[in-house]
Amino acid sequence: MASIWEETEADGLGEEVLKMSTEEIIQRTRLLDSEIKIMKSEVLRVTHELQAMRDKIKENSEKIKVNKTLPYLVSNVIELLDVDPNDQEEDGANIDLDSQRKGKCAVIKTSTRQTYFLPVIGLVDAEKLKPGDLVGVNKDSYLILETLPTEYDSRVKAMEVDERPTEQYSDIGGLDKQIQELVEAIVLPMNHKEKFENLGIQPPKGVLMYGPPGTGKTLLARACAAQTKATFLKLAGPQLVQMFIGDGAKLVRDAFALAKEKAPSIIFIDELDAIGTKRFDSEKAGDREVQRTMLELLNQLDGFQPNMQVKVIAATNRVDILDPALLRSGRLDRKIEFPMPNEEARARIMQIHSRKMNVSPDVNYEELARCTDDFNGAQCKAVCVEAGMIALRRGATELTHEDYMEGILEVQAKKKANLQYYA
């Protein structure tokens, strides 16, 4: 018995218990028993409430799952409103529950061209919504169930180049100055943005590449796309000329919107002269539509800031017919000229295109370059292809200097025939 009291004293309650009488101890014990019973009943009540709440949550989850069954009705968010019922209190007996709600409300327009006001937005957080968003709503209650990805024209999505081009700067001969200018205007602002910030200069918004056909404009754009990790959108000028009014301008808007979403990105517009010709008075609807498409392009070039990771590369071989508004500084800031290759460049181009061929050591590229006066880069490549076909025709295992000379004669004959044909 003494050991029990010693343990109690060790617990810090011994002195208090020793001073109490037996009746007081019995009374205290009864009080503790009643408190324990009350606590047990409280625990039981809370457990029942918890189970009831879990059942309710499960029931609501099942209802949400039923409501979220596809298909959704596609809608657009028109406006988001802050509603406070205290601002519009009026005397009256009839009080609508929805009118007493506080917080964000939404106005949506469905694909059936009906407009609805939603006092309860739905399962999407109001902070994540903004006017113009595409959402999926329940076809009966019109509650917003999910946000949908932004809708772009399927033709614009097809413009995105998924497979990277394989060209490299080393595959381009005689264009060292042009490569450096393009890298400074397009690649450096994307990969080394801090260099421009340290100097406090604004990088160019875009680049215009111009020159005769076959001088390597598109080839250099493909090499630039291969060397950067940016999204590459390739537009052709004739693609933007559409039959319906406003269709071409919408393509331009969607292309720039997609480029902004997937930034950093490069937009390459080939054959810019298809839509960028000088404006003139015309009564034909087709001419006016082309001019509207160009005006939308001008607007988009002015719309994004230079520090945004969206760059434009345009290419044309008729810079003389382009509208002056396209050529002014602030839109296509840097103009890069692609001249006809000189003798050294022609020799380098033929060397590049002969790298993978089985070529005899006696081939003199400098002499070949002297024989190909007024040839552009594409014709120099055609000489290499023709030389290979001539060697194949005679059953040779390697290309000789004579094969290249015959290839030059073949290309010159085609060139003269083409000139006579167009004359």
From Swiss-Prot:
Which SMART domains does the entry link to? AAA
Against SUPFAM superfamilies, the record matches this protein to: P-loop containing nucleoside triphosphate hydrolases
- Pfam families per UniProt: AAA, AAA_lid_3, Prot_ATP_ID_OB_C
Binding residue positions for ATP: G211, P212, P213, G214, T215, G216, K217, T218
Provide the alphabetized UniProt keywords. Answer: ATP-binding, Cytoplasm, Nucleotide-binding, Nucleus, Proteasome
Q: Name one GO molecular function term.
A: ATP binding
- Which gene is the coding source of this polypeptide chain? psmc3-a
Major localization class: cytoplasm
Q: What does this protein do?
A: The 26S proteasome is involved in the ATP-dependent degradation of ubiquitinated proteins. The regulatory (or ATPase) complex confers ATP dependency and substrate specificity to the 26S complex.
Which InterPro entries has this protein been placed in? 26S_Proteasome_ATPase, AAA+_ATPase, AAA_lid_3, ATPase_AAA_core, ATPase_AAA_CS, NA-bd_OB-fold, P-loop_NTPase, Prot_ATP_ID_OB_2nd
Q: Which domain of life is it from?
A: Eukaryota
What's the protein here called? 26S proteasome regulatory subunit 6A-A
According to the record's subunit comment, the protein's assembly and interactions are: May form a heterodimer with a related family member.
> What family does the entry list?
Belongs to the AAA ATPase family.
* GO CC term, one of those recorded: nucleus
Does this entry carry the keyword Cytoplasm?
A: yes
Q: Which GO terms describe its biological process?
A: proteasome-mediated ubiquitin-dependent protein catabolic process
Its subcellular locations are: Cytoplasm; Nucleus
